[in-house]
Amino acid sequence: MMRAYLCCSAALLLLASVPAPAQRARDLGIPFDGTPGPWNAITDVAGIEVGHTTLIEGDSVRTGVTVIWPRGRQSDDPTFGGWFALNGNGEMTGTTWVEESGFVDSPIFITNTHSVGTVRDSYIRWQADHHRRPGTNSVGDGFWSLPIVAETYDGFLNDTNGQHVQPQHVFDAIEHARSGPVGEGNVGGGTGMICFGFKGGIGTSSRVAGKYHVAALVQCNCGSKRQLTIAGVPVGRELDRPTVASIPKPLEDRGSIIIVIATDAPLLPTQTKRLARRASLGLARLGSVSGNGSGDIFIAFSTANPKAAQPSGELASVSMLPNDALGPIFEATVQATEEAIVNAMVAARDMTGVSGHTVTALPHDGLKQTLQKYNRLAQPAAR
């Protein structure tokens, strides 16, 4: 059977480090506040690397895995971090230790709901095989690893009970993580996701906040079409043609979103947790109410203060922004989150999956016409 997941190394590299899509939200003239970084991606925070493995096979496999390395895949140096669940009907492993220690001590993986265990165990196997040790949990020749793996449910388009994500797919995402443009839409863990009634997936965006950068990467699988609001315009209500074939109504309240916030601003763990909370406001700008069945789980980290987990002496010296200086960082978080979600939808393409279910993408022309109707269409961004 022909597979969209190709096994030769050259093809894997293409899948794992694809450039940003030809069109993103700003290219359509969608107005956003704030100034993005050069890539308008989470990789604008120096050192971060992102990898995807995308699985599209036959009529029913529509899934994958995405990995974010806070300091790049060559580093095991933890970052200060914190997490927040806006609504907890979901999973992000490793967060008990994040809460306790204040450190993000592994790459952050995102996949489908029923592949969390495979991804977690595969990363531990990769650590053991490559003699990589966590920065906080190692004694002598031994270590114990508590990887961070998050999920959203892709069962409308993917045979999620088939658990098609295998260890080699995790290894490939790890090994081919790169800086620079980040693939969006139907890639990695976002391959089979649905966002506000349209095809969703992976999206990213960044902001410049003074001399610092703040960025978001999302796996968007939440919301109903009637909620979708872009640039203050009720886009979902205006674009009322069917976009999801026979999706059960209760599923509208049971989607989820994973949001990863990164910054190079010097923040303490309690401050990164405050950043994670602000991602909620970016999501709310688009109309989400975070329903009872939704797993809306966010994690934030700061790449400042290297070696804070392994001080050379009895005392560790770290730097931090005063709380009174966090306003621009909070604002940038909200802005980057909002745009990352829209970028996921703009990049996504129509998809047919398991049981013949079809989800169509957000129509670019219809979106532009709707924004124009409300006098909210801007000049497309220069490329």
Description of each model-found segment:
Residues 12-15:
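Hydrophobic alpha-helical segments of integral membrane proteins
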Residues 1-8:
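Bacterial N-terminal signal peptides that target proteins for export
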Residues 17-19:
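N-terminal signal peptide c-region/cleavage motif recognized by signal peptidases
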Residues 22-383:
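Alpha/propeptide regions of enzymes that mature by internal proteolysis
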